[in-house]
Amino acid sequence: DAQEILSKAKAIADEQGVEATTLIVTGDPASVFVELSRNYNLIVIGNRGKGGLAERLLGTTSSSLPAYAYCPIVVVPYTDDDGNLMHLNNTITKVAVGSDESKWGLKALEIAANFAAAWDAELDVISAVPNMKGSDDEGVMASFKDDLEVRIKPLEEAHPDLKINKQIVPGPAVGALTKASYDHDVVVVGSRGRGGFTGLLLGSTSQGLLQHAVGPVYVVPRKYVEAAETRLDTVPSSPAEVKPKALDDIKGVEEVPVSKAEPDVVEAIETKIDPDRQ
């Protein structure tokens, strides 16, 4: 089965002009992928809901790949909560980002703005006001709005032509961003692994944003951000300086050559992914 899956994936990559290396991972996939993330700028996970690789990689906040990876992670849903096949856009016109004052949230904001600018897309910045005593007070809401303006100002200066919409929403961050996934092409979030706006996004496999979003979620992990800001000897000074790890040194990874799937198989897969493709 693994060989067949890799064969199809390689054929699709070849069709798009992308050089692909095929690997088989054994053992605990989350641990292996964390080590593999040292070697890549981005990891993409297809999520088909309950069961399968994605559920083992996402896990809980304490064990998930997005919480501990060295590079950003994109989680792409295959079906919605009811098992219906998702149809994702091939173009990006609207980007949403969850924003708070943490360094993880600020990095997610920066990445989302660069992403939206590159695609000439709109950027919706969402700041959630937690349910707590006095949270509906006008002064509290005004404070959140002022804080959001401060965070957005550098983006407006860096991207003067970028259309930025600001939203202050009451209630849990998870609900606000899950809702945003219905009418945005991608949702960008930061992850520090626990607590705060970003920590709530992972949660358990039954409650987290990553399990209920109906569109791609781009996660900016804690280690990626910390590597970008620190000058300590124990942590590289930028994500680009995270030392890669040779495949031979990563237990549970084997590079395997595979034959390319037949053209009709590739066409059937691509048609299933995008029924409107020409």
Question: What do the PLM-derived regions correspond to, one by one?
Answer:
Residues 22-24, 75, 125, 166-168, ...:
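A structural preference for short, hydrophobic beta-strand core positions in alpha/beta folds
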